[in-house]
């Protein structure tokens, strides 16, 4: 396994961003946000929804549900993620 390997969360969010995959984000309080991931860091996700940008704190997110399957092993450094 490569030491420069990206973690599964980052690989997942990055593919959502790069492929512009629509997502539903479920928050811990039960709210749902629908949109496209535009960026993320260690603590937040930027979601574009209805032409507006939302900064969502990761500690408030329970689930990220993409509208279609996400390939997190698209690049060699991701192939062993989760194994």
From Swiss-Prot:
Q: Which CDD domains match?
A: Hfq
Q: Can you tell which superkingdom this protein's organism belongs to?
A: Bacteria
Report the GO terms under cellular component: cytosol
Q: Which UniProt keywords apply?
A: RNA-binding, Stress response
The cross-references to InterPro entries, in alphabetical order and at most eight, read: Hfq, LSM_dom_sf, Sm
Recorded hits in Pfam families, A to Z, give: Hfq (PF17209)
Q: Which GO terms describe its biological process?
A: regulation of DNA-templated transcription; regulation of RNA stability; regulation of translation, ncRNA-mediated
Single GO MF annotation:
RNA binding
**What PROSITE patterns does the entry give?**
SM (PS52002)
SUPFAM superfamilies in the record: Sm-like ribonucleoproteins (SSF50182)
Residues of the Sm domain: 10-70
Task of the protein: RNA chaperone that binds small regulatory RNA (sRNAs) and mRNAs to facilitate mRNA translational regulation in response to envelope stress, environmental stress and changes in metabolite concentrations. Also binds with high specificity to tRNAs.
What family is this?
Answer: Belongs to the Hfq family.
Query: Subunit composition?
Result: Homohexamer.
HAMAP family per UniProt: Hfq
Write down what this protein is called.
RNA-binding protein Hfq
Species assigned in the record: Desulforudis audaxviator (strain MP104C)
């Amino acid at each position: 396994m490569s030491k420069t390997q990206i973690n599964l969360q980052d690989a997942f969010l990055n593919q959502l961003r790069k492929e512009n995959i629509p997502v539903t984000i479920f928050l811990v309080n039960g709210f749902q946000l629908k949109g496209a991931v535009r960026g993320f860091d260690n603590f937040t996700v930027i979601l574009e929804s209805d032409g507006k940008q939302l900064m969502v704190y990761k500690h408030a997110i329970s689930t990220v549900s993409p509208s279609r399957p996400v390939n997190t092993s698209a690049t060699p450094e991701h192939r062993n993620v989760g194994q």
